[in-house]
Amino acid sequence: MPALTRNKKKAATKSITPPTKQLTKSKTPPMKPQTSMLKKGAKSQNKPPLKKQKKEVVEEEPLEDYEVTDDSDEDDEVSDGSDEDDISPAVESEEIDESDDGENGSNQLFSDDEEENDEETLGDDFLEGSGDEDEEGSLDADSDADSDDDDIVAKSDAIDRDLAMQKKDAAAELEDFIKQDDVHDEEPEHDAFRLPTEEELEEEARGPPDLPLLKTRIEEIVRALKNFKAFRPKDTTRKACVEQLKADLGSYYGYNSFLIGTLVEMFPPGELMELIEAFEKQRPTSIRTNTLKTRRRDLADVLLNRGVNLDPLSKWSKVGLVIYDSQVPIGATPEYLAGYYMLQGASSFLPVMALAPRENERIVDVAAAPGGKTTYIAALMKNTGLIYANEMKVPRLKSLTANLHRMGVTNTIVCNYDGRELPKVLGQNTVDRVLLDAPCSGTGIISKDESVKITKTMDEIKKFAHLQKQLLLAAIDMVDANSKTGGYIVYSTCSIMVTENEAVIDYALKKRDVKLVTCGLDFGRKGFTRFREHRFQPSLDKTRRFYPHVHNMDGFFVAKLKKMSNVKQSSEEGDDDAVETVEQAEVSSDDDDEAEAIEETEKPSVPVRQPKERKEKKNKEKLAKSKEDKRGKKDKKSKSENVEEPSKPRKQKKKRREWKNEIAQAREEKRIAMREKAKEEK
């Protein structure tokens, strides 16, 4: 008999079990052991696990005809065994045992007669089939577990192999890269970049400047100068690259040769490009809160409500605000007109912060207009003490007085004097602190005034330096070294030129008894202690420089001096000599020899004493005349002396003239030799 599937076996059991249940209920009373056994048999009605169901479904075969015949035979069997006497406890126990042995959960109940008569009974086939399926299921489960373990091991091995391959590839790539670098260092590629020839430069000069070409050439030259050994153009020197860089920067950005040459000497190529690019951009607008009338937080809230986008300036300032954009004119708001804030660059805060004024002090602002620094000093002093706000130019006095009134400053006296005359007006050794924001070339604020690129020359820089030295000496003379709270001078400029900054401070250190002290600013670069052929005092590293590409503010210089005594190191004659040396410095380098010759000719010589000698001779002549009547012989001798004495200065004059001519000839020969050497070097 072919094997039955699970579903068909269930159908067979359904057709057989109902009559048996009815018989047991109607004819025989329920017994406790039987009911318990039936309950155990009922547990076998649970469905087998899904895994086994799927496997059994796969093994199914179509047996529709067999089902029909089986159902009829089984119905006959049930009808034959419908009597209560035929059903015994032994039979029921056997049926329950058969149901317990099979894990497929069949509920069929068969008698012993049916098992003997039918060779191919449903129970035997079902039980045999169920046992085989259990064994197959357990084997399949074990095989699945083993296969999963094998898959995990295989995957882990594959991952390990991939990692090993990646490490090998990375090591090989690194070795190749190192080899390429070594080859590049040994044999640089000269064909990558070359300087233009004279013919190419002439062709470029004929037409308008080719800005893209200039830009790329500037970038290539800067790249080569950063690492000249590796990126050196073929058959070129570093000097040639620097000269070409100066020319290209001047034509591309619009600088004159003097200014761009000075910047090239001050900064390395990479930083030079950052500085020049920063000069092409505007610095952010900043304002200073007037603490005499309001607080920064309150002012910020009011301006935010008016549509002003702002932030605190920085950690180093407690009163500054940065304005990004505004829906209203920032210089015409009601708060501005009421004096709650001052439009002021961030770099202008620094000199006042370095000065650190205290209450009830006497302070001088030598160049006060338009009043940003003066009003800041008054706010820090809380309108106590006394401030002398001096401005030499009359037109600028209007803006100074207007800002003082608007900001509510009441402790300031406005005066109009030349700063060099202030020690005579205010007196020497009479004030506690002096702020000198000296007039300068403005090379640190090119972003505000682009005319500086082409208007400033070496002669103008030297004139500014001469004026700055005189103003600084006057400022030092006004300060009282014995002041209990002060005795400080702050010197600042909006220039980045060494001639206007470190050179001026070095000059003051030599002429007055002062020393440099720290500015009290936590940021900023140290000043130069050496530049070109100049060597300054080591203490100049206490000065501070500020650049737009580093600190995002205008170029600025700040130095703070402490006066040690009220005694001058040099007399007035020394000051005059100092002025003469400055005037000589204004002479060009080609005329240095001529300047030396002029100095020597202008020096006081022996003929200056001639008037005194003549007076003495006249007195002698008078005495001789008075004695002529008494002594005639002596008169003759006196006459002979008078005749001989005038001959001496004449001989001396001849000697001096010859001496001057010889010196002039020697200097001309030196000039000619130096010019010939310069031509040969070129």
UniProtKB/Swiss-Prot annotation:
Regions of compositional bias (Acidic residues) in chain numbering: 58-103, 111-151, 588-599
Class in the EC hierarchy, top level: transferase
Function, as annotated: Involved in ribosomal large subunit assembly, required for normal progression of rRNA processing. S-adenosyl-L-methionine-dependent methyltransferase that probably methylates the C(5) position of cytosine 2268 (m5C2268) in nuclear 25S rRNA. May play a role in the regulation of the cell cycle and the increased nucleolar activity that is associated with the cell proliferation. Seems involved in the regulation of cell proliferation in leaves.
Highest taxon above the source species: Eukaryota
One Pfam match: Methyltr_RsmB-F
Tissues expressing the protein: Strongly expressed in tissues with high cell proliferation activity that have a high demand for ribosome production such as guard cells, leaves primordia, root apical meristems and the basal parts of lateral roots.
Biased composition (Polar residues): 14-37
Catalytic activity: a cytidine in 25S rRNA + S-adenosyl-L-methionine = a 5-methylcytidine in 25S rRNA + S-adenosyl-L-homocysteine + H(+)
Short motif Nuclear localization signal 2, span: 616-623
Keywords tagged on the record: Methyltransferase, Nucleus, Ribosome biogenesis, RNA-binding, rRNA processing, S-adenosyl-L-methionine, Transferase
Chain coiled-coil ranges: none
Ranges for region Disordered: 1-155, 567-682
Gene3D superfamilies, per database record: Sun protein, domain 3, Vaccinia Virus protein VP39
Biased composition, class Basic and acidic residues, residue ranges: 610-648, 659-682
Feature: compositional bias, Basic residues: 1-12, 649-658
Disruption phenotype: Moderate reduction in leaf cell number associated with pointed leaves shape. Defects in pre-rRNA processing characterized by an increased accumulation of rRNA intermediates containing 50-ETS, ITS1, or ITS2, with stronger negative effect on ITS2-containing intermediates. Higher levels of 35S, 27SA, 27SB, P-A3, and 18SA3 rRNAs. Normal levels of methylation at cytosine 2860 of 25S rRNA, but slight reduction of nuclear 25S rRNA cytosine 2268 (m5C2268).
UniProt protein name: 25S rRNA (cytosine-C(5))-methyltransferase NOP2A
Family: Belongs to the class I-like SAM-binding methyltransferase superfamily. RsmB/NOP family.
Source organism (scientific name): Arabidopsis thaliana (Mouse-ear cress)
Residues at the catalytic site: C494 (nucleophile)
Motif (Nuclear localization signal 3): 635-642
Sample GO molecular function, one term: RNA binding
A GO term from the CC aspect: nucleolus
Subcellular location: Nucleus; Nucleus, Nucleolus
Record: residues binding S-adenosyl-L-methionine: A367, A368, A369, P370, G371, G372, K373, E391, D418, D437
Motif (Nuclear localization signal 1): 38-45
